[in-house]
């Protein structure tokens, strides 16, 4: 969730792992993706889909994916649509209402980039699971989901609603819904979009202060990760930063943990890594966060 993507420590590819650049197709949009697999792939091995956060890319996840592959899994990272190497969205903007449009008039097509639409991110994550499910060597009964920051909420929402996902690991995850003035603004955007009095192409998408890209607020009103937790039943581990500066961890994974641990039979774990901030999870917190995720998938996939 950054204005610019931090420069992360470089990936040192293990000798036992190979990486292949692939394309995932999601609603006709090409998603830039990388597949990590052990060089000696067993006949049937677990697979993990990884989701980056706001302003990130597939490279945010590369060290985690390589580590999963080194542990014997097949891992898939991808960049969300409209960001970096993935394809744009095409938005059509007509000059007239449909009923009044001249027969010879074609609507204008606009390429849209760097937009956060949570439901589009969910669809792209599902497409990534579809892709991984068809990868030779992947055991379809042992697919895991991993997500970081805003992508952690996407992974959690997906795990609650996709029966193919059997284990979940998230870190510094943003999972709370919009509230207060932001929710009121999003509701108004949805109303105005439906009534044709607001056009994000002509009027501009909203910007979240301090964050890269743009926000399609009209699409946020029904995005509720915590509201999905009654359907989440897979083993779930959540990691937070002790000095998180972007949001209150008590309102996000802290709240998710309280909900999950109250569910009979739910396997869940919550850990706060001390002395790191949000982006510290990729630096001083990397050794701990990555090992917890690897161990979780080993135990539950």
Q: For each predicted feature, which ranges?
A:
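Conserved alpha/beta-hydrolase
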Residues: 65-90, 94-105
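Primarily recognizes the serine-hydrolase "nucleophile elbow" in alpha/beta-hydrolase
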Residues: 123-193, 209, 220
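Alpha/beta-hydrolase active-site loop
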Residues: 96-136
